[in-house]
């Protein structure tokens, strides 16, 4: 039997992943900052999932962006349904910590969100982000439309040129379409840094400017 450490740098195969559960984790369905629902159909609004390390700091990056309707912390990209935080930390779910971003395309462009994403972390680090090591910290963009997917790929290529010029390696960000199921994290993780202002935030960008979304 493989130990937990075996999955810190490798995503488990479906047969290796924890089974999870059918029932979603309990969730207080109101955003602590803006009062909007965390879960819903969000008719007339766009959605995207971003993974950029620990979701506590990542979610705060996006709830501060004007035009973002709501945000939520969760797990995506793996095999285990309705995983718990401890299960995700084991590396045996395949999930990355992700932020669901629901936004009004008339108020903020997808390119602006992409720029926020790229500049808020180091997308060249593979299965870690700073001192946070494991598959749950991998960089990811999970798109809900073909147009988002094309824009995400184009932004990656544009940012790679800037990173290369600054001496960084290859971008390891996972970019996918269609977006996988987003499993909401436990209630305490939602808007965590608003509940715990002195809480941990390990996010750190490269300092390299992303050449998209400048006029958004």
Swiss-Prot record:
One MF annotation (Gene Ontology) recorded for this entry: L-methionine-(S)-S-oxide reductase activity
Pfam families the record matches: PMSR (PF01625)
Cross-referenced InterPro entries: Met_Sox_Rdtase_MsrA_dom, Met_Sox_Rdtase_MsrA_sf, MsrA_MetSO_reductase
Keyword Cell division part of the UniProt annotation: no
An example Gene Ontology CC term for this record: cytoplasm
GO BP annotation list: cellular response to oxidative stress; protein modification process
SUPFAM superfamilies: Peptide methionine sulfoxide reductase (SSF55068)
Oxidoreductase found in the keyword field: yes
Catalysed reaction equations from the record: L-methionyl-[protein] + [thioredoxin]-disulfide + H2O = L-methionyl-(S)-S-oxide-[protein] + [thioredoxin]-dithiol; [thioredoxin]-disulfide + L-methionine + H2O = L-methionine (S)-S-oxide + [thioredoxin]-dithiol
Family recorded in the similarity comment: Belongs to the MsrA Met sulfoxide reductase family.
PANTHER family xrefs: MITOCHONDRIAL PEPTIDE METHIONINE SULFOXIDE REDUCTASE
Chain's role: Has an important function as a repair enzyme for proteins that have been inactivated by oxidation. Catalyzes the reversible oxidation-reduction of methionine sulfoxide in proteins to methionine.
NCBIfam families per record: msrA
HAMAP family in UniProt: MsrA
Name of the protein in question: Peptide methionine sulfoxide reductase MsrA
Species assigned in the record: Xanthomonas oryzae pv. oryzae (strain MAFF 311018)
Lineage of origin: Bacteria, Pseudomonadati, Pseudomonadota, Gammaproteobacteria, Lysobacterales
């Amino acid at each position: 039997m493989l130990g937990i450490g075996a999955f810190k740098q490798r995503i488990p195969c479906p047969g290796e992943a924890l089974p999870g559960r059918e029932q979603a984790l309990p969730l207080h369905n109101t955003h602590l900052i803006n009062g909007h629902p965390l879960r819903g159909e969000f008719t007339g609004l766009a959605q995207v999932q971003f993974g950029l390390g620990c979701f506590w700091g990542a979610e705060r990056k996006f709830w501060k962006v004007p035009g973002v309707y709501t945000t939520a912390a969760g797990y995506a990209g793996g095999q285990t349904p309705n995983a718990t935080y401890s299960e995700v930390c084991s590396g045996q779910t395949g999930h990355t910590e992700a932020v669901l971003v629901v936004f009004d395309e008339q108020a903020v462009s997808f390119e602006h969100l992409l720029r926020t994403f790229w500049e808020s972390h180091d997308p060249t680090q593979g299965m870690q982000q700073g001192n946070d090591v494991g598959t749950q910290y991998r960089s990811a963009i999970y798109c809900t439309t073909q147009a988002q997917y094309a824009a995400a790929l184009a932004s990656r290529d544009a940012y790679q040129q800037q990173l290369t010029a600054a001496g960084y390696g290859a971008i390891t960000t996972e970019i996918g379409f269609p977006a996988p199921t987003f499993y909401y994290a436990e209630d305490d993780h939602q808007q965590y840094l608003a509940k715990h202002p002195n809480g941990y935030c390990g996010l750190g960008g490269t300092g390299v400017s992303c050449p998209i979304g400048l006029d958004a």
